[in-house]
Amino acid sequence: MLQLNLQFFASKKGVGSTKNGRDSISKRLGAKRADGQTVSAGSILYRQRGTKIHPGENVGRGGDDTLFAKVDGVVRYERLGRDKKQVSVYPVA
C-alpha cells in the first residue's frame, strides 16, 4: 500500500494590506517677510489658516487669510493687547 507523508514547511502565504503609507504635502505656511525687511506693495507677508496674526497698518487680508502689503515700506511685527499679534507696513520717508 502506498503511504503519503505530506509535510508543509514554513512559507509566506497571504499578504495583508496596510492603512498607512501616505502623507499630505506641506502647505508652506508662516512668515514670508521678517521684521525690519523692506517690501513692495502686494508682497505676501504671512501665510496662515485663520487669523493667527492680524493685519495692521497698510496690510490687507486675502480670502485665505494671507496677509499682504498695501504700500511699499518696512515690515513690523507688533503685539496687539495681551494675546494677539499684528503685522504692519510703515512707508519709508
Swiss-Prot record:
GO terms for biological process: translation. One of its GO terms (molecular function) is structural constituent of ribosome. Pfam families: Ribosomal_L27. The keyword Ribosomal protein applies. InterPro entries: Ribosomal_bL27 (IPR001684), Ribosomal_bL27_CS (IPR018261). One of its GO terms (cellular component) is cytosolic large ribosomal subunit. The N-terminus is cleaved by ribosomal processing cysteine protease Prp. It comes from the Bacteria. Disulfide bonds: none annotated. Residues 14-33 are annotated as: Disordered. Keywords: Ribonucleoprotein, Ribosomal protein. Residues 1-9 form a propeptide. Gene3D superfamilies: 2.40.50.100. The keyword Coiled coil does not apply. Belongs to the bacterial ribosomal protein bL27 family. This is Large ribosomal subunit protein bL27. The lineage of its organism: Bacteria, Bacillati, Bacillota, Bacilli, Bacillales.
